[in-house]
């Protein structure tokens, strides 16, 4: 397993403290990796800053060609990446290979094309004898912090638009799940000029803080928790860096009486529990109108009970383990608190799985109330709650009564209602009669404490640029 850092085009061993990397399916240590030292963090940023002088002036065509080459080598090494992701994260191998690798490749190919379509506004003479034009230029060095739930996917979301826009990047994957990012570094070093991509390993305090606080870093992009986002925003405030934050969610799933219940059940069984529920857009907070509440709870409970947890390399496995022991305890505590309310009923699941690994049973909780913690706080596990509602006005208010604002869905056969409700929901994305679907061409990002800035799409590319006005006297 590739365990070296990428700094200025060279693979080097970390010079800091060694940290264990676990297999969550067994709890065993896969290997130990040495963190980057403070000097290595500084060297990576300075290498990126030096490389920016040339990379920032390359043509969109040249940048696109590099991104396309990277997409090709990821595709060629898809099985290797899927196996690493499965071992390090506990994902079912078939899901990593069939679902995630193609999407990751597509992200790089999309931004390769988008790089050649990013234009400033060619303006005119707004002052006599002067011509104005608008440019969109890269910022410089971008520090990208990727999470542990989709390590390679999130690395792609951060690297592709930043590089396409002409920036240089220092990427820090989560210390829990670094293996695919380090493998990506090995392949990328022969495609991009030295210093354009740098990949470090380490914890937030030892590597993340000196990286994001470095005076030569001009932008920080994070996918992570609200607490981490708050810390980075505060930590970078003295240097007035641009920040790009995706900080989780608690997606409301609004099911009206006229919805296709079978479609809802099938959808939530998939969209609520994919990746063991470790997804910020997971369909985890169901609001069911009272006319169909009992039927939905009964049918969904039966469907969720058929989900198969198991070994990641088993083709029949639908849910793998959670990513760490600490996160398993977090999910278990949230469910135990829900049980303790007295009014929430466990329809299925509700406990850790016996044996090795960090497994939690797929869980459905009914009878949850709007103010319950299980409704208001992100669990980030295979746990879905169901709350009954009376009418459209009530459910829109309840759905918006949340600190999160990332994703939502509305299930109804009434087209007018679908439009009305979608227009009022305070979420970055609203799906109608589906959930969870993402494409490279459309933006992904939130509101409120879910953060700001967009991933994917041309909007995501623009986030990694600065708008400049150039005026020429003639």
UniProtKB/Swiss-Prot annotation:
Keywords: NAD, Oxidoreductase. GO terms for molecular function: aminobutyraldehyde dehydrogenase (NAD+) activity; NAD binding. InterPro entries: Ald_DH/histidinol_DH (IPR016161), Ald_DH_C (IPR016163), Ald_DH_CS_GLU (IPR029510), Ald_DH_N (IPR016162), Aldehyde_DH_dom (IPR015590), Aminobutyraldehyde_DH (IPR015657), PatD (IPR017749). Pathway: Amine and polyamine degradation; putrescine degradation; 4-aminobutanoate from 4-aminobutanal: step 1/1; Amino-acid degradation. It catalyses: 4-aminobutanal + NAD(+) + H2O = 4-aminobutanoate + NADH + 2 H(+); 5-aminopentanal + NAD(+) + H2O = 5-aminopentanoate + NADH + 2 H(+). 4-aminobutanal can spontaneously cyclize to 1-pyrroline, and 5-aminopentanal to 1-piperideine. PANTHER family: ALDEHYDE DEHYDROGENASE-RELATED (PTHR11699). This is Gamma-aminobutyraldehyde dehydrogenase. It comes from Escherichia fergusonii (strain ATCC 35469 / DSM 13698 / CCUG 18766 / IAM 14443 / JCM 21226 / LMG 7866 / NBRC 102419 / NCTC 12128 / CDC 0568-73).
């Amino acid at each position: 397993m590739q365990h070296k850092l990428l700094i200025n085009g060279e693979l080097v061993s970390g010079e800091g403290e060694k940290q264990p990397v676990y297999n969550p399916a067994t709890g065993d240590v896969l290997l130990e990796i040495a963190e980057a030292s403070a000097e290595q963090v500084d060297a990576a940023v300075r290498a990126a800053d030096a490389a920016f002088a040339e990379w920032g002036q390359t043509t969109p065509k040249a940048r696109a060609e590099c991104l396309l080459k990277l997409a090709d080598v990821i595709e060629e090494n898809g099985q290797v990446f899927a196996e690493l992701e499965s071992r390090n994260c506990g994902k079912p191998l078939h899901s990593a290979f069939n679902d995630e690798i193609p999407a990751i490749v597509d992200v790089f190919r999309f931004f390769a094309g988008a790089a050649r379509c990013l234009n400033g506004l060619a303006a005119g003479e707004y002052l006599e004898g002067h011509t104005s034009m608008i440019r969109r230029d890269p910022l410089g060095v971008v520090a990208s912090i990727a999470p542990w739930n989709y390590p390679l996917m999130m690395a792609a979301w951060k690297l592709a638009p930043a590089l396409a826009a002409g920036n240089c990047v220092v990427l820090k994957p989560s210390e829990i799940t670094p293996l695919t990012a380090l493998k990506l570094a090995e392949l990328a070093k022969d495609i991009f000029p030295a210093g354009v991509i740098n990949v470090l390993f380490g914890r937030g305090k030892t590597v993340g803080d000196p990286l994001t606080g470095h005076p030569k870093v001009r932008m920080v992009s994070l996918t992570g928790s609200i607490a981490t986002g708050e810390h980075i925003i505060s930590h970078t405030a003295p240097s007035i860096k641009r920040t790009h934050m995706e900080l989780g969610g608690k997606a409301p799933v609004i099911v009206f009486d006229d919805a296709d219940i079978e479609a809802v059940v099938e959808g939530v069984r998939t969209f609520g529990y994919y990746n063991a529920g470790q997804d910020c857009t997971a369909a985890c907070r169901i609001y069911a109108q009272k006319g169909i509440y009992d039927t939905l709870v009964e049918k969904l409970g039966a469907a969720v009970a058929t989900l198969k947890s198991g070994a990641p390399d088993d083709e029949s496995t639908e849910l793998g383990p959670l990513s760490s022991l600490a996160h398993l305890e977090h999910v278990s505590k949230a469910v135990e608190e829900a049980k303790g309310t007295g009014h929430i009923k466990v329809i299925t699941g509700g406990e850790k799985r016996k044996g090795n690994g960090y497994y939690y049973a797929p869980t459905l909780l009914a009878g949850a109330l709007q103010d319950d913690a299980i409704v208001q706080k992100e669990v980030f596990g295979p746990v879905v709650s169901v709350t009954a509602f009376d009418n459209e006005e009530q459910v829109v208010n309840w759905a918006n009564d949340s600190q999160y604002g990332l994703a939502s869905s509305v299930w109804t056969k009434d087209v007018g209602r679908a439009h009305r409700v979608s227009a009022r929901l305070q979420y970055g994305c609203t799906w109608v009669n589906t959930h969870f679907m993402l494409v490279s061409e459309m933006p992904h990002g939130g509101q409120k404490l879910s953060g700001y800035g967009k991933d994917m799409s041309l909007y995501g590319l623009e986030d990694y640029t600065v708008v400049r006005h150039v005026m020429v006297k003639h």
